[in-house]
UniProtKB/Swiss-Prot annotation:
Organism field: Emericella nidulans (strain FGSC A4 / ATCC 38163 / CBS 112.46 / NRRL 194 / M139)
Segments of this protein annotated with the region Dehydratase (DH) domain: 1009-1509
Keyword field contains Glycoprotein: no
Pfam family, one: FAS_meander
Acetyltransferase (AT) domain as annotated region, ranges: 17-395
The protein's name: Fatty acid synthase beta subunit stcK
Pathway stated in the Swiss-Prot or TrEMBL entry: Mycotoxin biosynthesis; sterigmatocystin biosynthesis
Length: 1914
């Protein structure tokens, strides 16, 4: 083994060792067990075994000597046998605890521990002794201390054995003789059991007593001794409240019984009991010791022991080291005895001398380590006494022995030094700073706050004053602003803003809040949060008074307020411990403890000032982040300095316990700047006060009962004790506390108040600030119920208005008076003008005069009972200042009396008689004696203390050779782990190579040391930005990482430059520089800051200068000059976003228009963009690609980037682009315009459409358009949040421009038209024809201008009004028609937009979003998709043009306060949109109409994200899909977006005749407004034009219906019918101009007749379409087609080709014409019909050709009409028209063929047909065709539609169409590519090939002529 480095440190003088040894005590029980353990553990260690063997022999021989006690008779001292087999042969533990055994065993244990330690350190006992500075022993431990002191180094182990033998002999005889001399116990068994049951243990001769001080214990002992009992002795003083009593067991039991009646239970709450009156928490415990050591009871022992030891001698000069013990009542070093024998002294020190253990321990006060060799917990006793001296106890006995022996062999620092409180926490002198003439005092508090060590506490009302607080701060002291005196948000905010403007920029504010007022605290914390986080007020800390919140609440405040320190005012030991729990939970946050104890002014505890700190000091100092401040009772230098240097505790027998600062409170109330009324100041100065130096047993505590020193303690409104001056008012308060407010029973209180009513009222009126309210005109007290309205008014004014100063005490009192007048008005009023006048009066004279004028004698009416209650409620009203009077004696009397009782001390003028004796004046009983002068300036008060302290400090430093100045920096090693260093002259480089690095704080501390500017730049959390505080961006940016390089450059030995070079280790050369942060300290107080990054091959830089601010002490703080800094940032971003070669936009205004470059979209650029965006997302999505020329919608932002960012750089915005947050971005294609394609050339224009200023900054919205050939293609809208408000010196212009949604008004009544025309803002372009029945479309935009407070100031609304196409009432309005007028309105001071309000009430948006009734599509399996955020942002930055370095450079992102680089919001947006594009399968990028992402949180590279999709609405035929993106790890939403998607290509098909049925469409009619509107309009048209109820026909299907022509309207209807039949009288057979009616008949019901089936079907289908449109599901550009009749329905529903009513008339005409085209029998039936045929049901290979052949054969065989007229579904569905006989044959032939084995054979078909020809001859038009296997008759169809039979009627129908179809109504864009006509089956077109196709099918001669002209013009 190598020598111990620890002992090397001892030899070098770095450590000083002492030894201590234990004695009798609880360890007596286990002494032998430990001996056995050590004997076995060191069985192979010869020196240890030799000691055990020799000791065992000695003890065995001594026990064999005959003795008068006969103790060892029959049992002896067989130690060796016990060591070999203790279980079998050793005595019982209770016997071993007896002194004859325990005394030598304990001595041997200590010797053995010492020997083992020496052996382990490779020393002999003498060599170990040579390392010691001295030794002490607790009781018998002094024998071992003396033994090791005589162990010579020259003789090694033998010398030690001889010394051990001496110690054992002494121990044996003292133990035996003491046991024999002890008084015998006379306790009976029950008395012993009593002690055991009370937890006191088995009675013995020593009793441990803890919890009492020495004075109490001595009084108790004297009392018991005086009662004539056996003698009791205080034998050992183990600590400040730890004692041992010696005596006979029955005498000691008497002590136990006496203490049982006076001691307190540990669970008893005595926090409200003044500490001198508290019952002590006492613990008593008998010790297992069989003799009353250290008492006169053993006075006979010394002679007997000396006789027994015979010729043994020990001289003082035999001791090689000091050994301390008690001798003759004092502490002695036994070496001082010289040649005299000290054995008798040693014996007496154990038997009769009292042990003063603290005195023994203080003999080792220069120790660094005390080696405790036991037995028992003697080391703990040393630790208790010497804690705080820098000493550390090393326990080398018991269970900790082995581990501590190992530590002794490790290193010199393995055993840490204890804290030397006096040196570590005492004030230090800091040498004079530059610009200062004097040195200053430094403590933990001064280092934190940068102010002197004396501060001013938060006090209500004194430090509620911004002026006083500002004066203290300007005097360069720390003070707390008291929030407790503010009752609403507005006044607190105003005061704090005023204060922040009044203090130096480098100083900050600490706010004091009251935890016991939870309601006020809640809103005050919210106010502070807003002022700190949103306005940047320099509020750095809070102090919490009147309670300790939970750690969870504190965490919430820390996170919410971003405070730099938090202070608490604990009132007890338990509260201190709760603060320490908080401090341990937040070890990096400075936590202040302001200890004031019970002597504080104002609210106070009942604690002594000193005792709790003595108890808690060690625990407090174990939390390095705790700052300890002493308050209460202070006011000068002499009384405070002992608490600063810690000497106060030395007087009490403790180590020095310095505080970090001094807190002054009520002392400041007499300061000149305090608002305390002068009369109050005089009373304070006159109060004598009391002293409290810790030795007067708390004289101030008597304030609880009566005035002491002019101060008394009363119970405040919060129910807490409060110290106040003993004015008449406060003596009354105290009296009422005792007499009335202490009564808890409401009935008893009521009775007491009633009994003493007169006395109470008189005392209030004579002595208190709040007089009795109700009094008569002759000033006689009465009750409110007896007052008149006039008397109430007069008394209110008298008590709330300060007449001689012509002011209301508080503005809320004027409101109270006005509210009472309103109450009176409600009772007495008549609504006269005079009544209204008094509500505008503001003085009592005016108010009373107006009241008299209004009511005269009525005012003398006594208050109505209801009004009494209302008046009391007004007095109680929350939010107003509590009333300054007592209105009644009721259950709330204490509240009336005490509420809001502190303000009067600052406004005696508002008190009755201006009598200061009537008010509550906060003062402390001790502190008040220091206030001797009124109106002393705060600076003089505070400087007087600190300057005197400085003189005292300089004097102490001059006499202390070991004193260290604060400026002296401890030398540190030059190396930090993980960092390589190189030096080149004055340049030092640090290469951060890893693999691990020290913390940033450690690196910064190593770099800057005592460099003030470096500390300000790299360590200060805040900087001054403009006039407010902001996080220090340099500190945030300076976070060195592995691979980085730091350069430090020095000049004249001073740090001048610091540069951090950032490199990316994963990208090649570790020295490759990606960015840099450079700091240069310029001459004077300037610091230059440079940030470099790399972008597009350039190195754009941010360069600016900062100013150093600060006083002559404490840390400096940097100030960023806002204008210069923002100019620098704008230059950087101009370079990044726009380019140096382009003109800067900073000089133009907020209303300017900005343009981007002219850009041609190339496939290469788009593909590069897609490649970058496609790198993130699920694997399948990354592998997926799109095609086609359409440009992705996200790329529009890339094109528009320059135009979108130019406005941000406006100087007028006063914005910091580094603090820019992208809130949202909306991109949408202009409807109806071809989207962007590759190859398009576009330009961009933009402008600011919103600029609003909030408490946290600005919200700026920029709108832009991409224009192709001058026309908008894409519209963009992006919103930025710019943190930090603009300065008041720049433009505060706020506005919002809104493109309102197109609004539609249906002018469906004359009333609505008149209302519209009455609006002044509705301006027609010229005379307009009747607008009734028309639809107006409003396309408007609004501009709102806001005032400085953000409230709307003016509104401008303008835009155009257009007439919708005539048919748009049927379907949703999808197009805009002709302009007919405009809207223009300007208005100031408005609440809402009146134009939009009108349009919303009378109209609706043109495009309405329709929520889905149930959750829609969620992407199926892709409803929740996980993916990884982009791994890097450089690629996106390059392709997008957004080269903002916060996305790519850690230095810049940290500088901006964002931490690590943030993924571009638009990069994430493009990634998410592409994933959605993949999910919907939009391969050609055509389905996105708009994309609007909003960004909710920051996303870092490689974050795991989850994407959720929900289709939740439809809008104008498009799907509206909501997308959420969340972080997988936390569930935090980081983005949400809305996509408007075209549906997959949809075709709308309308059915034809044959599908009608009774009641069709009526279910929808009953449930859907849009469908009902269509039916109702059709109904109105048919009734008005044709006298028919279409709804009746549909609902009832009548077989006949008569239209009467008798009336005038009936004749008009007849004329309409006649005009329809002019060209074809067969249409309405029998109708003439003389017809008085006309009846329609049809046997199957009119709904089955063609004439009514066709319009009914058309209306039903258009209604269905309108329903779909109202749900927003109709695709606006969808393809549509109609089957036969359905073609009319499709054109009516999907186009504006014809007005709805005209279309219905056309279809009715068509139906009538077809209905009567063919002859009918008497029952109205024709010979024709139609069937649907499905050839596949005959056989699967029966094809279309076979069906056509079959139809031809049937027609041929029957000789009548049969044709295939509709080709619906290939090989599946066809419709055949023909004669009923041929249809019958076809149906039966199909049935036969389906059973045939060869149905395709022509022969088989002919045979089947032939088989049915004979039977068909009996088929007539009355025969009902039945359904066959392959055929279905079309019910109600008896016309062979689409057959050759009807061709002869085409010309007539063509003429009708030409007459009714207007070319002007036809819009080709509604038809081309969308309509699929029946005749072609191909989408409609207007090109020549399509015309040729139509002409070929129809043989149209006009089309043939058109084609000829086209050919000629080519």
């Amino acid at each position: 083994m190598t020598p111990s480095p620890f002992l090397d440190a001892v030899d070098a003088g770095l450590s000083r060792l002492y030894a201590c040894f234990g004695g009798q005590g609880p360890s007596n029980w286990a002494g032998l067990d430990e001996l056995v353990h050590l004997s076995h553990a060191y069985a192979d260690c010869a020196p240890i075994q030799d000691l055990l063997d020799s000791s065992a022999r000695r003890l065995e021989s001594l026990a064999a000597i005959p003795h008068r006690s006969s103790f060892f008779a029959g049992r002896g001292f067989q130690l060796q046998a016990w060591l070999n087999d203790a279980a079998a042969s050793a005595p019982l533990p209770e016997d071993l605890a007896l002194s004859p055994y325990s005394f030598p065993i304990n001595t041997l244990l200590s010797l053995l521990h010492y020997a083992i330690t020496a052996y382990s350190l490779q020393l002999d006992p003498g060599q170990l002794r040579q390392k010691l500075q001295g030794a002490i022993g607790h009781s018998q431990g002094v024998f071992v201390a003396a033994a090791i002191a005589i162990s010579h180094t020259d003789h090694g182990w033998p010398s030690f054995y001889r010394a051990a033998d001496l110690a054992l002999q002494l121990s044996f005889w003292v133990g035996l003789e003491s046991h024999h001399a002890s008084p015998r116990s006379i306790l009976c068994a029950n008395e012993v059991i009593d002690c055991l049951e009370n937890g006191e243990g088995a009675p013995s001769h020593l009793l441990s007593v803890t919890g009492l001080d020495i004075n109490h214990l001595e009084r108790l002992v004297r009392k018991l001794n005086d009662q004539g009992g056996d003698s009791l002795y205080i034998s050992l003083i183990n600590g400040h409240n730890k004692f041992v009593l010696a005596g006979a067991p029955h005498a000691l039991r008497g002590v136990c019984i006496a203490l049982r009646s006076v001691k307190a239970s540990p669970e008893l709450d005595q926090s409200r009991v003044p500490f001198p009156l508290r019952r002590s928490v006492v613990d008593v415990q008998f010790l297992p010791v069989s003799a009353p050591y250290h008492s006169s009871l053993l006075s006979s022992v010394e002679l007997r022991v000396t006789d027994a030891i015979g010729g043994l001698r020990l001289r003082g000069n035999d001791l090689a080291i000091p050994v301390y013990c008690q001798a003759n009542g004092s502490l002695r070093n036994l070496q001082d005895y010289g040649t005299h024998d000290i054995l008798l002294t040693l014996i007496q020190s154990v038997t009769v001398e009292r042990v003063n253990w603290p005195a023994l321990c203080w003999a080792m006060n220069d120790a660094t380590h005390v080696l405790s060799f036991g037995p028992g917990a003697v080391g703990s006793l040393v630790q208790d006494v010497l804690e705080g001296t820098g000493m550390n106890v090393v326990n080398l006995s018991g269970q900790s022995m082995a581990s501590n022996l190992s530590l002794l062999n490790l290193s010199a620092f393995a055993l840490p030094l204890g804290k030397d409180w006096g040196r570590k926490y005492r004030p230090r002198l800091r040498k004079a700073a530059e610009g200062s003439a004097h040195a200053s005092i430094e403590t933990k508090m001064t280092r934190l706050l940068g102010t002197p060590h004396v501060m001013v506490a938060g006090m209500t009302p004194t430090t509620c004053s911004p002026e006083l607080v500002a004066a203290i701060i300007q005097a360069d002291y720390h003070v707390e602003f008291a929030c407790g005196g503010y009752y609403n948000r507005a006044t607190l905010e105003t005061a704090l803003r005023q204060l922040s403007r009044s203090i130096p920029p480098h100083r900050s504010i600490t706010c004091n809040v009251i935890y016991a007022s939870p309601k006020a605290l809640s809103w005050q914390i919210q106010v502070l949060r807003r002022l700190i986080m949103e306005e940047g007020l320099p509020i750095d800390g809070i102090t919490v008074g009147a309670g300790i919140p939970s750690p969870e609440v504190v965490k919430e405040w820390i996170d919410m307020l971003a405070i730099s320190h938090i202070w608490f005012k604990p009132g007890s030991v338990d509260a201190i411990d709760r603060v320490l729990t908080i401090a341990r939970q937040y070890p990096t946050l400075p936590v202040g403890i302001q200890w004031t104890g019970g002597r504080a002014g104002g609210h106070h505890s009942c604690e002594d000032f000193h005792l709790p700190i003595l108890d808690c000091y060690a625990r407090i100092r174990n939390c390095e982040n705790v700052i300890l401040v002493a308050g209460s009772g202070f006011g000068g230098a002499e009384d405070t300095w002992p608490y600063m240097n810690g000497s106060w505790s030395c007087k009490l027998g403790y180590a020095p316990m310095p505080f970090d600062g001094i807190l002054l409170g009520s002392r400041m109330m007499v300061a000149r700047e305090a608002k305390t009324s002068f009369a109050v100041k005089q009373l304070i100065v006159e109060a004598p006060g009391v002293k409290d130096d810790g030795n007067d047993n708390g004289a101030w505590a008597k304030c609880e009962h009566d005035a002491v020193g002019g101060v008394i303690s009363v119970t405040s409104e919060m129910g807490q004790p409060i110290h106040v001056l003993a004015t008449r008012a406060m003596r009354l308060w105290k009296e009422f506390d005792d007499r009335f407010f202490s009564i808890r029973d409401p009935k008893r209180l009521k009775a007491a108040l009633k009994q003493h009513r007169v006395e109470i009222i008189n005392r209030l009126n004579n002595d208190f600030a709040r007089p009795w309210f109700a009094q008569t005109d002759s000033s006689k007290p009465t009750e409110i119920e007896e007052l008149s309205y006039r008397q109430v008014l007069r008394r209110l004014c008298q008590l709330t208005y300060v007449q001689h100063q012509a002011r209301w005490i508080d503005s809320s009192y004027l409101s109270l008076v006005h509210d009472f007048l309103r109450l009176a008005q409600g009772r007495l009023g008549s609504g006269s003008e005079a009544e209204l006048r008094f509500l505008s009066c503001n003085t009592p004279i005016e108010l009373e005069a107006s009241f008299d004028a209004a009511y005269g004698v009525q005012g003398d009416q006594i208050l109505y009972p209801e009004d009494v209650s209302l008046l009391i409620n007004l007095f109680r009203r929350q939010g107003q200042k509590p009333v300054p009077f007592i209105p009644r004696l009721d259950a709330d009397f204490q509240t009336w009396f005490k509420k809001d009782s502190l303000w009067q001390s600052e406004d005696v003028d508002a008190v009755v008689d201006q009598d200061a004796q009537r008010v509550c004046i906060i003062q402390g009983p001790v502190a008040v004696r220091h206030s001797r002068v009124c109106d002393e300036p705060v600076k003089d008060i505070l400087d007087g203390i600190t300057e005197a302290h400085l003189k005292m400090m300089l004097k102490e430093a001059a006499s202390d050779n070991g004193y260290t100045w604060a400026n002296q920096r401890d030398e540190k090693g030059n190396r930090l782990p993980g960092i390589e260093t190189s030096q080149e002259g004055s340049l030092c480089r640090y290469y951060l190579v890893g693999p691990t690095l020290p913390s940033t704080e450690a690196i910064v501390e190593h770099l800057v040391g005592e460099c003030a500017w470096g500390y300000a730049a790299l360590s200060q959390k805040k900087v001054v930005f403009g006039q407010n505080r902001a996080p220090n961006p340099i500190r945030d940016a300076f976070k060195p990482d592995i691979g980085d390089v730091i350069e430090a450059k020095y000049m004249d030995g001073c740090l001048r430059e610091i540069t951090l070079y950032h490199s990316l280790r994963r990208q090649g050369d570790p020295r490759a520089i990606r960015a840099a942060l450079g700091l240069i300290h310029l001459d004077g107080n300037k610091v230059s800051v440079t940030l470099l990054t790399r972008s597009k091959g350039k190195r754009p830089a941010l360069e600016f200068k900062m100013e150093l601010l600060g006083g002559t002490m404490g840390p400096l703080i940097l100030k960023m000059h806002r204008t210069d800094y923002l100019d620098s940032v704008r230059r950087l971003y101009t370079d990044l976003w726009i380019g140096r070669d382009l003109p800067s936009p900073t000089s133009v205004g907020l209303n300017s228009e900005f343009t981007g470059d002219r850009v041609t979209i190339t496939a290469e650029d788009v593909n590069t963009f897609l490649a970058i965006v496609g790198q993130a997302g699920p694997a399948r999505c990354r592998a997926w690609g799109t095609r086609g020329p359409v440009v992705p919608i996200d790329y529009a932002v890339v094109i528009a980037w320059t135009a979108l960012t130019k406005p941000i750089l406006l100087e007028a915005l006063d914005a910091d682009p580094l603090r820019l947050l992208h809130q949202s971005a909306s991109t949408r294609f202009v409807p109806g315009i071809r989207p962007l394609h590759v190859g398009d050339t576009v330009t961009t224009s933009s402008r600011i459409t919103e600029r609003t200023i909030t408490t946290i900054g600005q919200r700026v919205e920029i709108s832009a358009e991409l224009l192709r050939e001058g026309k908008p293609v894409v519209r963009l809208q992006t919103t930025f949040i710019i943190q930090r408000r603009p300065e008041e010196s720049v433009s505060q212009q706020q506005f919002r421009c809104v493109e309102e949604p197109d609004m539609v008004i249906r002018v469906d009544s004359h009333t609505k038209l008149r209302v519209l025309m009455s609006r002044k803002w509705f301006l027609l372009d010229g005379p307009c024809s009747d607008l009734i029945g028309k639809i107006l479309i409003f396309q408007l935009h609004s501009q709102t201008v806001f005032d400085a407070a953000g409230a709307p100031a003016s509104l401008q609304v303008s835009g155009s009004v257009s007439l919708a196409p005539s048919d748009t009432s049927v379907v949703c309005v999808s197009s805009v028609g002709t302009r007919i007028g405009r809207v223009y309105m300007e208005e100031e001071g408005f609440g809402a937009n009146p134009v939009m309000d009108f349009l919303n009430r009378h109209g609706a948006p043109r495009v309405q979003r329709q929520p889905l009734p149930r959750a829609g599509w969620t992407g199926d399996d892709a409803a929740s998709i996980s993916f990884t955020a982009p791994a890097q942002s450089e690629g996106y930055a390059m392709v997008s043009g957004d080269t903002n370095p916060i996305h790519v450079c850690p230095l810049f992102s940290r500088f901006a306060g964002l931490g690590q680089p943030v993924v571009h919001g638009l990069h994430l947006s493009a990634t998410v949109r592409r994933i959605l594009e993949w999910i919907i399968g939009d391969n050609e990028r055509t389905r996105f109409c708009s994309w609007a992402p909003s960004f909710d949180g920051l996303v870092r590279a490689n974050d795991r994200l989850r994407m959720e999709i929900q289709h939740f609405a439809m809008a104008d035929g498009c799907m509206v899909v909501h997308v959420r993106v969340l972080k997988e790890s936390t569930g935090e939403q980081v983005m949400h977006a809305e996509a408007v998607l075209e549906q997959a290509q949809t075709t709308y098909v309308f059915t034809g005749q044959g599908t009608q049925e009774r009641g069709m469409g009526m279910a929808l009619y009953d449930t859907n407004a849009a469908a009902r509107a269509v039916w109702d309009r059709a109904e109105r048209h048919f009734r008005s034009q044709y006298g028919i109820s279409l709804l009746h026909i549909v609902r009832e299907n009548p077989t006949s219906l008569t239209v009467n022509f008798g009336s005038r309207r009936g004749r008009q209807i007849r004329d309409i019918y006649l005009s329809m039949s002019d060209s074809d009288p067969s249409m309405l057979p029998g109708l003439t101009r003389d017809s008085r009616s006309y009846t329609f008949n049809y046997p199957s019901g009119l709904l089955m007749s063609t004439q009514f089936a066709q319009p009914a079907l058309a209306v039903m289908e258009i209604a269905e379409y309108a329903h779909l449109q109202a749900q927003g599901v109709v695709q606006t550009q969808a393809i549509f087609a109609g089957h036969s009749l359905g073609e009319y329905s499709s054109l009516g529903a999907c186009t504006t080709i014809m007005p709805f009513e005209s279309l219905l008339s056309l279809i009715l005409y068509r139906g009538l014409k077809m209905q009567n085209t063919l002859p009918r029998n008497a029952n109205g039936r024709t010979d024709y019909g139609m069937v649907a045929a499905d050839p596949s049901r005959i056989r699967s290979d029966f094809t279309e050709d076979r069906l056509i052949e079959l139809v031809r054969l049937v027609s041929q065989a029957t000789g009548v009409l049969l044709e295939v007229v509709n080709y619906n579904v290939h090989s599946r569905q066809y419709v055949c028209a023909g004669h009923v006989r041929s249809l019958w044959v076809l149906s039966h032939a199909c049935d036969d063929l389906s059973r045939s084995t060869s149905p395709n054979s022509p022969q088989t078909m002919s045979e089947c047909i032939a088989h049915h020809i004979p039977s068909s001859c009996s088929v007539t038009n009355e025969t009902e065709l039945s359904r066959g296997r392959a055929t279905i008759p079309l019910a109600g169809v008896d016309i062979p539609f689409h057959s050759q039979m009807l061709r002869g009627h085409i010309d007539g129908y063509r003429q009708y169409l030409r007459h009714h179809l207007r070319v002007s109504d036809i819009k080709p864009e509604e038809l081309v590519g969308r309509w699929i006509p029946n005749v072609t089956g191909k989408p409609f077109a207007l090109d020549a090939p399509y015309i040729r196709l139509v002409q070929g099918v129809t043989q149209s001669r006009p089309l043939l002529e058109l084609l000829r002209r086209v050919e000629e013009n080519r």
